């Protein structure tokens, strides 16, 4: 299973031309894995400040991936997930969510509610990227 997964990622990254396939796979998959398994990622924990920093890291990683994939052949699953991830982190940034107390509880404050939605969307879409790209564990 792991060999097949590594082959899929290597072929995906080879097709994108983002460098030496094994090195690019290690770097990009490692970054996706780290963000996915972080406290604000799949664990749904972390302080508001941690989660704001986490979204900034997801945003940076997403922009780098999108840039490296421009004009390249990329698997459909991955090419569909990246724009959704860019939208989710963009919503977080647009609402200036790093300035509010973002968490997972419901809020009557409209801005906090939008920030909670953006955080949850970012987690969900990053999970989709993690699984659609078959990032090795």
Regions found by a protein language model. Give the residues of each.
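General helical structural elements
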Residues: 7-8, 127
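Hydrophobic alpha-helical membrane segments, chiefly transmembrane helices and signal peptide h-regions
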Residues: 8-12, 122
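C-terminal motif of bacterial Sec signal peptides marking the signal peptidase cleavage site
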Residues: 13-17
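Immediate post-signal-peptide N-terminus of mature secreted/exported proteins
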Residues: 18-56, 60
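C-terminal amphipathic alpha-helix
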Residues: 28-46, 91-137
């Amino acid at each position: 299973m792991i060999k097949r997964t590594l082959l899929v990622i290597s072929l995906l990254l080879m097709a994108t031309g983002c460098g030496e396939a094994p090195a690019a796979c290690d770097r990009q998959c490692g970054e996706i894995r780290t963000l996915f398994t972080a406290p604000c990622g799949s664990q749904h924990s972390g302080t508001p400040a941690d989660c704001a920093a986490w979204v900034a890291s997801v945003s940076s990683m997403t922009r780098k991936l999108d840039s490296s994939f421009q004009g390249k052949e990329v698997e459909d699953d991955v090419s569909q997930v990246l724009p959704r991830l860019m939208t989710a982190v963009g919503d977080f940034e647009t609402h200036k969510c790093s300035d509010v107390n973002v968490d997972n509880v419901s809020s009557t404050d409209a801005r906090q509610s939008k920030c909670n939605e953006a955080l949850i969307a970012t987690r969900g879409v990053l999970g989709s990227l993690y699984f659609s790209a078959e990032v090795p564990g």
